[in-house]
Amino acid sequence: TDQAATAFAAGKVDAVGAFPPFTGTAMKRPGARVIASSKEYPGAIPDLLAVSGDLISERPDDVQKIVKTWWDVREFMEKNPRKSEKIMAKRAGIPTREYKQYKGGTRFFSLEENLEAFSDGFGMKHMPYAAKQMADFMVKVGFIPEKPDMSKLFDSSFVKNIS
């Protein structure tokens, strides 16, 4: 994404799909403007933690520790927002003030929202539904030849163990 944003900023390509912090690079191009963002499509572009099925079957305790660590980090972020912003900005390689610009477009799910996201239902807030919609679209436009088996794609047990 960094190379694509840099190419766009240099005028080598006409459009780019980017996410923070690379949107900052893209927006340095004179006349650049955002034509669509994830703000207009809530729930359609989630960030998530994915691990292999092998890791789950071979080291489930370690996977559980990773998930617990995420919730420990979330608690730290809530209790230490300024320090968290500095840490995340440094990790992204951008000034804290620039990181703050992106913060409004970032939403972290609560534990309850995570559980709901794993559940069956209709609408993009339900990951099984969203995955089906995306797979159908990718088949329709020829990006993939057929819809993959998604029966074992989501495992809510690690999040449920936190609650």
Feature locations, PLM:
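Pocket-lining segment of extracytoplasmic ligand-binding domains
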Residues: 2-96
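Residue-level "edge-of-site" marker
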Residues: 21, 40, 102, 151-152
